Swiss-Prot record:
InterPro entries the record matches: Ribosomal_bL36 (IPR000473), Ribosomal_bL36_sp (IPR035977)
Chain segments annotated as coiled-coil in the UniProt record: none
Any Pfam family matching the protein: Ribosomal_L36
Statement: the UniProt record of this protein carries the keyword Acyltransferase: no
Organism: Sulfurihydrogenibium sp. (strain YO3AOP1)
Protein's recorded name: Large ribosomal subunit protein bL36
NCBIfam families, per the entry: rpmJ_bact
Cystine connections: none
Any single GO BP term: translation
Gene behind this protein: rpmJ
Superkingdom as given in the UniProt entry: Bacteria
Length: 37
């Protein structure tokens, strides 16, 4: 999980979602998981 100021999808499998008011990227590849901080 990376904490970034701006989250961007890194591949075509990445999905941008909102959880508890936070923007997150979830993906099949665990290295692509990101959370906005």
């Amino acid at each position: 999980m990376k904490i970034k100021a701006s989250v961007k999808p890194r591949c075509e499998k990445c999905r941008i979602i909102r959880r508890n008011g936070r923007v997150m990227v979830i993906c099949e590849n665990p290295k692509h998981k990101q959370k906005q901080g």
